[in-house]
């Protein structure tokens, strides 16, 4: 049996090795970044230093389970609720309408599947555009296999969806209109407010994939009549693997994972 002293010695050796290795990797990374001119921020962004500084304490000191009842967990819970409130403020909505997810893809899936399940139609119908992110398009294709009907609207030469086409596409079985706020490849910004006015008048849920827009341009969820909105942290200098779904007050989301 290995003695405690020997185990501690081995751990110390491993620690020193990793410390040296991390130092080398960090230097190599800094040298690489000095040579790099990065212009692909539409794909992803580097976390701001203050983002990393804000996160580190919760990987070391405040690592408690936020659902626990002791102080260490309460500290984590306060941080989560503070972040939730900050996000809500940017959209002008209530704190309890923000649901954290692993990113834009999960948020998009949750929004579309919620609308279908909650729509209470025998053959639900979705209206979306032909230039949506694959998180929307692939989810729609999957839902079509389950009997959901989907209308894919074309865009004009500016890459935008015409609101009048959205209005014509809505039928009695339409449970959702989903149009991205800004396109991730050509940058076209959709007429969200006009589309929101139509869906509100028609009493159809309106979802927008705002992954490419949130943090870049002001978004007013209530004024735009947005019922559901997706966003992803890595697109606005936040950590990867984080995102959120906004669901208008009164919408009762069902969990996707049980």
What role is predicted for each listed range?
Residues 26-258:
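Pyridoxal 5′-phosphate
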Residues 13-32:
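Short, Lys/Arg-enriched N-terminal segments with co-localized hydrophobic residues
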Residues 7:
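C-terminal active-site-capping segments
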């Amino acid at each position: 049996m290995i003695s405690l002293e020997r185990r501690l010695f081995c751990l110390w050796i491993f620690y020193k090795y990793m410390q040296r290795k991390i130092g080398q990797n960090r230097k190599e990374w800094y040298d690489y970044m000095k040579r790099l001119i990065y212009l692909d921020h539409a794909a992803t962004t580097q976390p701001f230093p203050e983002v990393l500084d804000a996160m580190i304490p919760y990987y070391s000191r405040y690592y408690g389970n936020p659902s626990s009842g002791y102080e260490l967990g309460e500290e984590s819970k306060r941080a989560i609720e503070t972040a939730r409130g900050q996000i809500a403020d940017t959209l002008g909505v209530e704190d309890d309408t923000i649901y954290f997810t692993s990113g834009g893809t999960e948020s998009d899936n949750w929004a579309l599947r919620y609308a279908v399940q909650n729509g209470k139609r025998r053959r639900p119908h979705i209206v979306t555009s032909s230039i949506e992110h694959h998180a929307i398009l692939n989810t729609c294709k999957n839902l079509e296999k389950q009997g959901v009907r989907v209308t894919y609207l074309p865009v004009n030469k500016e890459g935008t969806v015409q609101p009048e086409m959205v209005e014509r596409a809505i039928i009695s079985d339409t449970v959702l209109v989903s149009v991205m706020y800004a396109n991730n490849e050509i940058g076209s910004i959709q007429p969200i407010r006009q589309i929101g006015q139509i869906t509100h008048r028609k009493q159809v849920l309106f979802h927008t994939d705002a992954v490419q827009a949130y943090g870049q341009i002001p978004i007013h969820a209530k004024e735009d009549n947005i019922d559901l909105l997706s966003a992803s942290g890595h697109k606005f200098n936040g950590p990867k693997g984080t995102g959120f779904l906004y669901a208008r007050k009164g919408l009762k989301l069902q969990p996707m994972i049980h």
